[in-house]
């Protein structure tokens, strides 16, 4: 709805005001609900992960690194036709980077570390969806291992709570 920018010394300062994200739910809240009440079947979870992966991939394709890609900053909405839309907030720490790989390392690590309650298979499915691949390539394996190593190091300080498990019917 509004954008303003001015130069302050060597830096630029900007403000962005957008419309309310009506009908959207933060992935952090959605996943918390899944942890408390049991996750829906994979066929219902994966469209959310696909929408979040596509949004992140689009940002990285344009050289935009979010720098704080936490589940609380990513929102999804289920549309009437069953499709899922994703939106991201808190872009103030976003930066342009010359390489999608540079963007990916930081943002995928951040999301992975804060999504350790997701099952490993869901996180791997998200990762492959982000990369738009069906099977892991040597580059994808290198990137996955790098992200996992960083997450494990961070987990020694702040271990994750719980894992998502599908509801038992």
Task: Please provide the spans of the model-predicted regions.
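Hydrophobic residue at the +6 position relative to the catalytic HRD Asp in the kinase catalytic loop
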Residues: 69-76
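Conserved ATP-binding subdomain of kinase catalytic cores across diverse folds
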Residues: 1-32, 36-40, 51-62, 66-67, ...
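C-lobe/activation-segment region of protein kinase-like
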Residues: 84-156
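Short alpha-helical scaffold element within the canonical Hanks-type protein kinase domain
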Residues: 45-49
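Activation-loop N-terminal segment of eukaryotic-like protein kinases
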Residues: 76-83
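An acidic, Gly/Ser/Thr/Pro-rich helix-cap/linker signature
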Residues: 144-147, 162-169
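A short, structure-level motif marking secondary-structure boundaries and short turns
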Residues: 39-42, 112
